[in-house]
Amino acid sequence: MKGNLAYSATLVFLLSGFNAFAFDSFIVIGDSMSDGGNRGNDSRYLAGSHSKLYNEILSEYYLNKPFIPSNFGGDNYAEGGATADKLSPASIRTSEQQIDFYLSRNNGRADKNGLYVVWIGANDISYNIVNSVKKLDFHGLLHKGEDYLISPSPDLAVASVKKLLDAGAGYVIAPNIPKAGLSPWTSVSLFSFAEDALGDKFNAQKFYKQMNDELKNKGEISSEKQRREYIVDAFKAVLDKNGLPIPRSVVNVYQQLVTDVENRITGQFNHSMEKGLSKLHGNIIWADVETLFDEIILSGKEYGFDDVLVPVCQIGVRSFHCKEGAETYHDDKVYLFSDWFHPSPEGHALIAQYIASIVDAPYFATSLSKSLENLNATHQSFLDGQLQNLRNNPGNNKLNVFGGFSGSAKSAQGNRMDLSGRETANDLNVGLSVQESPALAYGGMISASDGDYKVNDQYRYDSRGMVASLFIQSSADNGLWGNMSARFGSLSLDNIKRDIQLGKATRTENGKTNATGFGVSLNAGYNYKLTDNITTGPVIGYQYDKYKVDGFRENSGSSTAMHFSSQKQERHVVSGGWNISTHSLPVNPYFEIKYHHHLQDDAMSVSGALNGTETSFTRTGKKPEKNRTSVKLGATAALTDDLNVFGTINYNHEGNNNNAINYTFGANYSF
């Protein structure tokens, strides 16, 4: 019961953002880690009757639909026992044959906007070790370098990824393999070897159960040394119980040797595979499940796991035979493993969270340019208020000093993939203008900005920076007016925080970077005189902006830390609307409504990857709304002959409940 509650809570959190629909399809190639039942329940290695594999959770998250095995018409081609090399029985497709089967159903082409998983290699390692021992070929087993020398299996796994990319696959997730020495099987490896050698003459199940019972009574693990000591203690207790008084030192040496060999070989396989993948071209999403499991096993409680030594199903019982109500099924605690190799339902849910965090991260990072957009918008909004003030209060040979505050606030309702959460920015503005004549004014302005952005429940950052502009404005007696401004800004984006939910743990990755922007605005209008104090007329505008956000690296050494490329964007926006203004009154209100249209609406693109890999992939962010409407209400007032004040409130609507408000308040003093 306890495990079911933890599993349900994890699913609720992950699937709360399932409206993403970021991909058109989801296809999985692999072995029993991913097999959803291509041969019925006997190939579904997962404890419990209603549990979900990591890929079934991801399918609901990204496509909002169940994930069905390929033999039943779906896109899960993974088969239990599968390998990259031709090592399994002929009835089990290799990863390459699974891809061939998939392509044969899809006219030989992969989906350019599809998300693929190729998770293969664990069975290759098992076959390779057994075959090497049978042949007395220990060269690859004893090799202590970084590369895998036992067989070409890592290269064949890479070839499977390449085959999908060559067929047009958009994104390929390539998880590595958790250390075999950390699985429950390692604790009973000696008994497993005896069972293989002696068959029915050796009652392995008795030893498995005794080992399972001994390990279940151990406490929390805080180090690898402690984990090994628990296993050695349990191993020694079982041997003593069965009249085999082998010295503890011998047991320790054996256990350490087996664990080290398994872990080293797994690490070599992962290294060779990653090295091969780094030479490919395409969107490869490397998922470091090896390091993730290292972190979980040494801090199980933090992630919500009560036991990382024994599985849900008693050691020696395969998980597809282990369902609720069976004597060998345990739901008293939350376990990391279903059986002696495969993850538990909670383990699969955590893997899904982990993979989703990697896939989504560059997409979230595309939102960083919003700070530049807001800085430009609040700066320009204040400048427009000053230019309106100058039009309302013309003069000759006046030197004007002006300043004040401006800011913006936005709160949008949607899922985390909309990238439109809460945004606030506040600016301090100061400027200088020269009024050469009633018809001509020019000057400059500088703004210091402070912003706070919560893009969604997983991504947030702060911004601090400055923007400076030069402007010129001309007004004619017949009511025509026009102005132009050019601006340059720079920002420090600090406290970039990306939250990753992993079971019960919330991990936060931190980073920081810089951003720069350049822009030009052109505005013109005509004021038709309705009365001595009221004018009205059309307004038109054009705005060009160019943004750049530098690349950055998250600063932890964890399995989730990533690095991201720089991002650039150009925007061209035309606008048209209508203005009603008052003049020569103690307080001169004005109203303006505008329609804005993006001529170029390309979205930001960002490449990213885990810090420990040379592979990378690129995600494109959300396209800006093609059209938006703004409504401005403002006023200017002459307090004295030399002192004027002005203020505006500007409401922007972009659809999808995405609304923003800009405000300005300033004063102008003439000398």
Label every PLM stretch briefly.
Residues 366-530, 535-536, 650-664, 668:
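Outer membrane beta-barrel translocator domains of Type V secretion systems
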Residues 126-133, 142-150, 186-191, 257-261, ...:
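Extracellular/periplasm-exposed beta-strand and loop segments of Gram-negative cell-envelope proteins
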Residues 22-394, 407-413:
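Conserved active-site regions of diverse hydrolases
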Residues 354, 445, 467-474, 564-671:
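Outer membrane beta-barrel transmembrane domains
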Residues 17-19:
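N-terminal signal peptide c-region/cleavage motif recognized by signal peptidases
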Residues 28, 78, 117-121, 176, ...:
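Short beta-strand segments
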Residues 33, 62, 355, 407, ...:
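Short beta-strand segments enriched in hydrophobic/aromatic residues
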